């Protein structure tokens, strides 16, 4: 091995190999499709607790739910809900 070499396979060898592209031609589109399904089915809203676009404003509350005092934020949030 040459000085300073970590013994790892060179990146140029990896990306020019058939094995690399066989594996990644499956995994990259699969990750894209999984992400698209995660968002389009609404599961992302449920997992992260984010309100859906039609849930930001209710019939009773038509203004922005804004917290003004960070020291009393819990009380302000309870009042907003």
Curated annotation (Swiss-Prot):
Cofactor: heme b
Gene Ontology BP terms: photosynthetic electron transport chain
Gene Ontology MF annotations: electron transfer activity; heme binding; iron ion binding
Record's cofactor remark: With its partner (PsbF) binds heme. PSII binds additional chlorophylls, carotenoids and specific lipids.
Sequence positions that bind heme: 24
GO cellular component, one term: chloroplast thylakoid membrane
Transmembrane segments: 22-36
Membrane association type: Single-pass membrane protein
Chief localization: plastid
Stored Gene3D superfamilies: Photosystem II cytochrome b559, alpha subunit
Family matches, as InterPro entries: PSII_cyt_b559_asu, PSII_cyt_b559_asu_sf, PSII_cyt_b559_CS, PSII_cyt_b559_N, PSII_cytb559_asu_lum
Subcellular location: Plastid, Chloroplast thylakoid membrane
Record key words, sorted: Chloroplast, Electron transport, Heme, Iron, Membrane, Metal-binding, Photosynthesis, Photosystem II, Plastid, Thylakoid, Transmembrane, Transmembrane helix, Transport
UniProt function note: This b-type cytochrome is tightly associated with the reaction center of photosystem II (PSII). PSII is a light-driven water:plastoquinone oxidoreductase that uses light energy to abstract electrons from H(2)O, generating O(2) and a proton gradient subsequently used for ATP formation. It consists of a core antenna complex that captures photons, and an electron transfer chain that converts photonic excitation into a charge separation.
HAMAP family cross-referenced by the UniProt entry: PSII_PsbE
Family affiliation: Belongs to the PsbE/PsbF family.
PANTHER family referenced in this protein's UniProt entry, alphabetically: CYTOCHROME B559 SUBUNIT BETA-RELATED (PTHR33391:SF9)
Subunit structure: Heterodimer of an alpha subunit and a beta subunit. PSII is composed of 1 copy each of membrane proteins PsbA, PsbB, PsbC, PsbD, PsbE, PsbF, PsbH, PsbI, PsbJ, PsbK, PsbL, PsbM, PsbT, PsbX, PsbY, PsbZ, Psb30/Ycf12, at least 3 peripheral proteins of the oxygen-evolving complex and a large number of cofactors. It forms dimeric complexes.
Protein name: Cytochrome b559 subunit alpha
Organism: Cyanidioschyzon merolae (strain NIES-3377 / 10D) (Unicellular red alga)
Lineage: Eukaryota, Rhodophyta, Bangiophyceae, Cyanidiales, Cyanidiaceae
């Amino acid at each position: 091995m040459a000085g300073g070499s970590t013994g790892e396979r060179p990146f140029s060898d990896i990306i020019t190999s058939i094995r690399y592209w066989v594996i990644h031609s499956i995994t990259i589109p699969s990750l894209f499709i999984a992400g698209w399904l995660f968002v389009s089915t609404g599961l992302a809203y449920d997992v992260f607790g984010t309100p859906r676009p039609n849930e930001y404003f209710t019939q009773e509350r038509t203004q922005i739910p804004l917290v003004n005092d960070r020291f009393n934020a819990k009380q302000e949030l309870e009042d907003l809900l």
